[in-house]
């Protein structure tokens, strides 16, 4: 048995047992382990205090994940070891993924839905964010959340990893900084923040502002107004190094390269109904299989009669229809969004294409692998008076996502 103590904190005791399986090899508790299968053996603390890193890392790898999170607060050495890239890469942890719900009237926490367990839980926010930022969650990617600080003035952004409880404040390039369509894009090397910005003058042209965590600097590119009209409110989707946007009137796919800010325009060939029109078009991307999908409403005179899903075939640069929403489900969805398709947005989450509406607390999703449609039920903790402003995000906790 040995103890780990941080200055001013209660010690945590690690108790060894005579069993050797990974699940029962180590136990921990504030004083001693009540669940040990055999009597603990007192070990010389001088020996354990000089334990080599590779042995300590092996012992830590046998602990349950929740125990590891508790041990982070014991000392800086343990925290840096547990969060080190080598430890994370050598020891895989099975972490659940969630659909996160944000609402303007939620200030201290976010509801989380686990699709695998079909259950709800809560993600509390640290005090530094909870007072102002719950209503201003802007984007999420690979376990990182991006908030705007001081919503009334927006002078900086905050990148937050809820799992490691680490955060970084990013100063915006100027003040005031009116922006739109912000997207957080992560990679093994860090992350980038994309947004469109303009000056206070309504007649001024807009620019792409791109932040790179590698050199912690902003760059600016032009050419936005030629491809995206003012008032366009659908976030971009990351695919093959670029952010893609879909316009429905007229139907148009545009993309911007996140390295050089260059815009590309393509209509995209596809088998679309000749006598109908695309009433709305939304893009989602599978980051693991690198597949781009489009969810589109088909109808006439601005009224959606059916909802379809297309897959983009890069080798032929064409869209292939892969799924049609059942009529009875389509009628329910179009009724809850009141045929106001500007309220419709889509996101990708772990083999699921999620179709959401800002004024409806449920999610309609298509499981790509099973080819089945489902509804995510309303969160039981939501007040009945909340009738709009629902915004969903994919949240996949990650220890390796650095701020």
Swiss-Prot record:
Keywords: Kelch repeat, Repeat. It comes from the Eukaryota. Kelch repeats lie at residues 91-140, 192-240, 291-339, 343-393. SUPFAM superfamilies: F-box domain (SSF81383), Galactose oxidase, central domain (SSF50965). This is F-box/kelch-repeat protein At5g43190. It comes from Arabidopsis thaliana. Residues 45-91 form the F-box domain.
